[in-house]
A protein has these predicted regions:
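N-terminal V-set
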Residues: 47-86
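Generic leucine side-chain signal with a strong bias for well-ordered alpha-helical environments
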Residues: 7, 13, 69-70, 102
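Structural signature of extracellular immunoglobulin-like
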Residues: 37-47, 54-61, 103-105, 111-121
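Small disulfide-bonded, cysteine-rich extracellular recognition modules and tandem repeats
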Residues: 26, 45, 60, 69-72, ...
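N-terminal Sec-dependent signal peptide, specifically the hydrophobic helical h-region
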Residues: 1-29, 119-132
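Extracellular beta-strand/loop-rich beta-sandwich domains predominantly from IgSF
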Residues: 27-31, 78, 82-110
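Solvent-exposed, conformationally flexible loop/turn segments
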Residues: 33-35
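Short clusters of hydrophobic/aromatic residues that line enzyme substrate/ligand-binding pockets
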Residues: 23, 66, 89
């Protein structure tokens, strides 16, 4: 097989423009060599009313639903992941460049999939009801 040593991943755009928030993947397809590290990039923009953003990464294999891998919050340096997400996946967030990336360490053929980035914004407000 000619391409047995290559990984091909296809990426789709996911965005939420209802409030002026948007996320875009920089490449439609990335080809990597087996055992190398692969990095996937998304840029985002937030409306002026969006104080915080959650940037998610999903993996979808043929015939399956997207599987949540991990996410980062713009206002935090913590990376949150599902219990099943392997240590080979990590994400980075550069708020000055408005960019997030997913790194796949030691890429293997079984990592061939569609990887999706997604953006969700929240408005945090607290409501109190005082009772006497």
């Amino acid at each position: 097989m000619l391409y047995a040593g290559l990984l091909t991943a296809v990426f789709y755009l996911t965005f939420d423009s209802s409030r002026g928030d948007e996320i875009n993947q920089l490449n439609d397809t990335i080809t990597s060599k087996v055992s190398s590290d692969t990095r996937i990039f998304c840029t985002y923009s937030l409306s002026s009313s969006a104080d915080n953003a959650y940037l998610f990464w999903y993996k979808q294999t043929p015939g399956s639903s997207p599987r949540y891998l991990l996410h980062r919050m713009k206002a935090s340096t913590d990376e949150l992941r599902s219990d099943e997400t392997e240590a080979m996946f990590s994400s980075q967030l550069d708020t000055s460049q408005k960019m997030t990336s997913l790194t796949i360490v030691n890429t293997q053929l079984c990592d061939s999939a569609v990887y999706l980035c997604a953006l969700s914004t929240t408005v945090l407000s607290l409501h109190y009801c005082l009772l006497q």
